[in-house]
């Protein structure tokens, strides 16, 4: 093409889907990726989790249950992860196990971009959104009216640790 025939795209990020390459499992690779939401050169990645916590297969496109949103450093399902943890908004905070807190979702209600992830958690009637920062992420959870809603924080695997310090709001 000549310079005159080249079309400039105004917002190229709109053409990116981080779901590409997520239809993989141990017997077949379609990329072995997960829908990472991260800043360039950020400290960590954030991703929805459809696999069992800590098993290496963080997200599989054909699994329609989200178990949490994980802070991860995982480069590949074959290498696994370290220092990871997950958070999950729930309508009933008494159900803390990963199976009890999981929620069905559909890809029609999922937006997966490098700078933004959003999904509607059908079982909890919660809309979850996240956007990365250099060292963490900002979340927005839209809950139905309820007195039992909450957020589960799960340091679920070896090498992970979380300490909540209420008096320091940290």
Which stretches of residues belong to each language-model region?
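Accessory carbohydrate-recognition regions in carbohydrate-active enzymes
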Residues: 5-170
